[in-house]
Amino acid sequence: MSKCRKTPVQQLASPASFSPDILADIFELFAKNFSYGKPLNNEWQLPDPSEIFTCDHTELNAFLDLKNSLNEVKNLLSDKKLDEWHEHTAFTNKAGKIISHVRKSVNAELCTQAWCKFHEILCSFPLIPQEAFQNGKLNSLHLCEAPGAFIASLNHYLKSHRFPCHWSWVANTLNPYHEANDDLMMIMDDRLIANTLHWWYFGPDNTGDIMTLKFLTGLQNFISSMATVHLVTADGSFDCQGNPGEQEALVSSLHYCEVVTALTTLGNGGSFVLKMFTMFEHCSINLMYLLNCCFDQVHVFKPATSKAGNSEVYVVCLHYKGREAIHPLLSKMTLNFGTEMKRKALFPHHVIPDSFLKRHEECCVFFHKYQLETISENIRLFECMGKAEQEKLNNLRDCAIQYFMQKFQLKHLSRNNWLVKKSSIGCSTNTKWFGQRNKYFKTYNERKMLEALSWKDKVAKGYFNSWAEEHGVYHPGQSSILEGTASNLECHLWHILEGKKLPKVKCSPFCNGEILKTLNEAIEKSLGGAFNLDSKFRPKQQYSCSCHVFSEELIFSELCSLTECLQDEQVVVPSNQIKCLLVGFSTLRNIKMHIPLEVRLLESAELTTFSCSLLHDGDPTYQRLFLDCLLHSLRELHTGDVMILPVLSCFTRFMAGLIFVLHSCFRFITFVCPTSSDPLRTCAVLLCVGYQDLPNPVFRYLQSVNELLSTLLNSDSPQQVLQFVPMEVLLKGALLDFLWDLNAAIAKRHLHFIIQREREEIINSLQLQN
């Protein structure tokens, strides 16, 4: 059978072939829509700007009763194992088979639940203004968009229906590559982002956080080439599993900033789609009133492909009245932009008409009823599900697929019409990030108990044993070798990216997120976040990591072995003796073994004495020192030479960029870890074999980076250099794999030491008590 032959899509029965009760359930599933409708007396009007942000929030009993009754039912889920509950609700989800069917049958790009949800919205409401079709140009802005499924869905809709307009888009999300961003706040999937980076705006600080006024100003400049924005979407949220009952309040500031951004950027007559959750709180009531006053039509819609048991809804706003109509109010709203806006209510309670509150309550009751019924039914079926119920669910799921395809008339789209026709990146971080959040496999109650434990209790109970004890010796030359060939580095296309100084390194595209998170917790809880090794650790010499340390002899032996391998594959043997440049390792210079290398030392005592902290290799002082040593080293090297270079870690884009440069000018790079028994100091070295020369333009570019680093440090600037090699380059497969291996070895070695130290202190403490 030919590998190119496509798997046939399963032919499904038409909806008419299902029983009336199945059809009735599916009709209801696709009919969760509430339209506000405005009173004829036109009493829904915005208040005078002088009245906004003057009063405290006033919660209303009718809405609080709805919130409390919903949370009572949600609390019944607290003792359920999340993996078991998710597996159960995946089966009871009537729309659960739609996504995979759509992906196969119409060749949908980035076909996720969000893709299908947005397609339902596109096909249910006239989101795209007629003006866009008349002028032949559509501009859209997508806020909090990761991973990009709304964009992919819109592309499919436009291309498959052959709408006569040229489409331009700009997107924003929390930058998955920014080291100070918390992965709990992000969707760690960069399949689309990595291949379309030029269309993503991460703001002046490069974080992607929309909740700052500087971001809003920068975004307006970024989209200034668009004559008008016809459509804005905002799909923002973050992980609320630590406090699911307060999801609405936790995301209220984000919703406010999304709304203000949309009202500031959207053109007259445009459309806005906003993801919200429950709308019981006063802050949500205010936002809904604002939107009803700013748009001709407001609908609240729950797509069939949105899981029926959650609170998610989409507010669909049509025919924007324009910035001019609300200019005085909008100007004042931007002054309260940010995370602290919820301290005062947007509107005083008395300015919101009773007719709006009544209509809004009807909306909340409408969706509250459906959610309550779904959760209660899922609990009942979780405890006992018979064969008849399983068969009915299977029929419902099959009927939902057919109804979806028939109702929305989805069409096949060839890959030539995708946003990313062929990925230019061999391996984005997406494949590595999936499946790493093992906290999902605990019940809510278990997670809360774990959060309540002190750091020492967690160590004593062995919660981190797997990270510490799986840390074995990394043998260089066996698996982690980065092979390079002389290549033309297009550094004229690169640019230096500055941003706000990193307070700490919370995430990295070059490391397993769980390992980094655990290491940071260990440093923060055990060592106070940052420390001085001279004062804190030298008096406690009994604390040393028990794992094997590579001796100087083994390091040189490995280096010689790699050098010989390289010489064996070379046609022309270098006429001069190969030089080995040691950076910062004065002890290696006096090694008593015969090696066929001319050993030279580039002294840099500071480079090896940097210690592990919450900043890791994000410290600008360390980065400047490392780059300075690298530039001095490159001046000393000739073709075929080798180098031993100590490295603290490579979590940041800056350090990954330097490893990429090394990768391009050496035939082989591998690493050795650990090389030191000193606690939490630099414990890894790079073995760089077969120097191939660095082009002068690249060397000069690195010099300019170094000069900027020095300028920023000497002026005590709040900025630092975040990146100087494009992410598209850093995400290439071989380099990414190497960095993951290197960082895992370093992080686990530090974890091993910290946890071993804590265990010894716990044991000593218990012995003293006895």
Curated annotation (Swiss-Prot):
Annotated active site: K117, D235, K275
Gene3D superfamilies for this protein: 3.40.50.12760
Compartments reported by the entry: Nucleus; Cytoplasm
EC number in record: 2.1.1.296
Any Pfam family matching the protein: FtsJ
Source lineage: Eukaryota, Metazoa, Chordata, Craniata, Vertebrata
Effect after changing T89A: Strongly reduces mRNA cap binding and catalytic activity of the enzyme
MF GO annotations: mRNA (nucleoside-2'-O-)-methyltransferase activity
SUPFAM superfamilies in UniProt: S-adenosyl-L-methionine-dependent methyltransferases (SSF53335)
Protein name: Cap-specific mRNA (nucleoside-2'-O-)-methyltransferase 2
Effect of mutating K74A: Strongly reduces mRNA cap binding and catalytic activity of the enzyme
Organism: Homo sapiens (Human)
Gene expressing this chain: CMTR2
